[in-house]
A protein has these predicted regions:
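A short His-aromatic
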Residues: 98-102
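Class I SAM-dependent methyltransferase Rossmann-like catalytic core
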Residues: 1-22
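S-adenosyl-L-methionine-dependent methyltransferase catalytic module, highlighting the catalytic core
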Residues: 64-78, 82-85, 108, 112-114, ...
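Class I SAM-dependent methyltransferase SAM/SAH-binding core
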Residues: 19-84
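Short conserved AdoMet
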Residues: 20, 104, 118
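Short catalytic/ligand-binding loop motif for oxyanion handling, primarily in non-cytosolic enzymes
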Residues: 33-37, 53, 103, 131-137
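Short alpha-helical segments and helix-capping/turn motifs at coil-helix boundaries
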Residues: 9-14, 27-31, 108-110
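Hydrophobic beta-strand segment of the Class I
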Residues: 94-95
Length: 218
């Protein structure tokens, strides 16, 4: 309704408050809730998935009921420089909401975006507090991990990242109130067992498969 729309507009205004939104911008991973509005902003939408994969995810996600999938303009294919995937034109800001935690090499990802922005541009990121998500029990990502990934340069979530996310996150079935304190992890419903997590970790290594997980915790 109107109140929901207003809340989204207020959220977008806060996120974009330091961006030159009257100039050309870039939004990474808009999915079904872009921060920018293509009817108001001159923006290029990019995602690591192509349109077909995004449509599949959209159909299978119960949280997308009543929503619309934002069409993308370019695919930032894993392992390819962003500059090779988009038009060579000046961009004056970039925005990504709830994308950063999915990135296997955070520092490298940021550098790729910096490389296509004009000097002095702004990057606006929305990163969820893990204490309000299914990552509640996970340890925050460390400086050493971020720097290590910047050296290793993984182009897809690593076996360790997959293993950690699947084995240390709980299933959000709507029954858990994150504001009232949580019981021990062992008492919560899990979507994956430790054996499942290990199996997926082995699978992504063997098949070089891109399994979308929360690679980092903030």
């Amino acid at each position: 309704g109107r109140s929901c729309l207003s809340a989204r507009q207020e959220r977008a205004a806060a996120i974009l408050s330091q961006c030159e939104v009257e100039r050309r911008g870039l939004e990474v991973g808009p999915y079904f809730r872009p921060v920018t509005d293509s009817s108001l902003h001159d923006v290029l939408y990019v995602d690591c998935c192509d349109e077909g994969e995004l449509q599949r995810k959209f159909r299978e996600n119960p949280k997308t009921a009543g929503e619309q999938l934002q069409p993308i303009d370019a695919v930032w294919a894993p392992g390819r420089p962003l500059s090779d995937c988009i038009s060579h034109e000046p961009f004056y800001y970039a925005v990504a909401s709830r994308v950063f935690e999915h990135v296997p090499n955070p520092l490298g990802w940021l550098q790729e975006i910096v490389n296509v922005l004009q000097p002095g541009s702004m990057i606006a990121l929305v990163i969820p507090d893990h204490r309000r998500t299914i990552d509640y029990y996970r340890k925050p990502t460390t400086f050493a991990q971020v720097m290590g990934w910047s050296v290793e340069k993984p182009v897809r979530p690593t076996p360790s990242q997959v293993m950690e996310f699947l084995s240390e996150s709980f299933e959000d079935d709507g029954a858990v109130d994150l504001n009232s304190g949580l019981p021990p992890f062992s008492e919560l419903k899990r979507h994956y067992t430790d054996q499942d997590a290990l199996g997926f970790a082995q699978f992504v290594e063997r098949e070089k498969y891109y399994l979308d997980v929360h690679c980092t915790v903030w």
